[in-house]
Amino acid sequence: GSIIMRNLEKYKGVIPAFYACYDKEGNVSPEGVQALTRYFVEKGVKGVYVNGSSGECIYQSVEDRKIILENVMKAAEGKLTVIAHVACNNTKDSQELAKHAESLGVDAIAAIPPIYFHLPEYAIAKYWNDISAAAPHTDFVIYNIPQLAGVALTQNLFAEMRKNPNVIGVKNSSMPVQDIQMFKQAAGPDYIIFNGPDEQFM
């Protein structure tokens, strides 16, 4: 196999999910976002996972998600590894967020599979690769959360995605612990498997 040289150290450590921050009117709060980011910096965590499930991304507009990420990056001042979840329920918006995230200098982008309709695996791979192509210089993390997305990352789909050199690993929030072992074994040391559920912290 080819030897992949990449620095995965920046992904090793505690990377909490970033919570949605709103003002009293229910709008995204840039001040709140910056305050929470600074809190994480002070606590000494390795990084943050922005605009994921805890960030309520599926209820937010593209514009809101950009504002959140911009304010995280501003307050983090390079002290945190930032993984930005960019998936929307259409490729175009996802690509726009991916491109935006890369322009801000995030460490990685992440995406869940398309939700609602259960698409065949080749369509999921195309969706992910199209998003990744919009941020060609940025690491890509697959987000496996079958209980919410309705589709699971299979070994075949993972193998297909590893052909994309930007794919560095999986954020796994499926419940069976065996899944993590399985992905680890399949991918080897050049990939990182992030563990989603707190109760499986390793």
PLM regions and their residue ranges:
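Short, Lys/Arg-enriched N-terminal segments with co-localized hydrophobic residues
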Residues: G1-I4
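Catalytic alpha/beta core domains of metabolic enzymes, predominantly
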Residues: A134, P146-M202
